[in-house]
Amino acid sequence: RYPYTGVLGILSAEDHEKVRSAMELVHAWDLKDRDFSAVSDGQRQRILLARAICQEPEVIVLDEPTSFLDIRHKLELLSILKEMVRKQHVAVLMSLHELDLAQKVSDLVICVHGDRIERCGVPEEIFTDEYIRQLYGVTAGSYNASFGCLEMEPARGKPEVFVIAGGGSGIPVFRQLQRQGIPFATGVLQENDVDYQV
C-alpha cells in the first residue's frame, strides 16, 4: 500500500483494512505474523498475490502463479482471479505451463514459442491436438482437448488384451495397460463415447 501512503509511508486505518481484506481473500491472514522467509513456497505465492491485490491495480501480471500450490490452493487462486476479473474489472495476465488450467480459466490465450508470439485466440481455437503437438513438438502421445490433458502413446504391438468399455468405464483400464506397456484393443465404441477419446 506504500504508493498510497505519502512521503512518510504511514499506513492509515483504510490501508490496514485493504491489506487485511487482500490477505483474507487469498486465505493468508493466518500468516500475518509469520516471517516471510519461513513460510512455504505456496504460502509465499498467496502472500505476494495479496500484496499485489491491496495495491488496487487495473492489471495484474503473474508469472506461474500456480507453481508450488497444491490442487486445492490452485483452484482457490484461480477462482479468486476470475472473481477479480468479473467483479473488480481487473485484467489478469499470467503465464501458465499447465495446459489443463489455462484451457479452463483463460478468456484469451497467447502462445509463445521461443522469443515470439506464435498464436493468439480463445481456448477453443488454441487447445486442439494438432496445434498443441505443433507448438510443443510432441511426437509421442496426444493432447485431449475434451479433458484438457495429455495422453500417453499406447503400447505398440499385437494386442494382448481386449477391453470391453464404454461410458468412461475403460479409461482406468486403458491407462493401467499403458503404464505397464501392454498393447490392447477395445470396442465397439461410438465416436461420442468418452472412452473413444482416450
Write out the residue ranges for each language-model feature.
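Conserved ABC ATPase signature
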Residues: 9-11, 35-39, 43
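Conserved ABC ATPase "signature" region
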Residues: 13-32
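Hydrophobic anchor residue at the start of the ABC signature
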Residues: 49
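Conserved catalytic motifs of ABC-family nucleotide-binding domains
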Residues: 56
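Catalytic Walker B motif of ABC-type/P-loop ATPase nucleotide-binding domains
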Residues: 60-64
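Helical segment within the ABC ATPase nucleotide-binding domain
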Residues: 75-87
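ABC ATPase nucleotide-binding domains
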Residues: 137-197
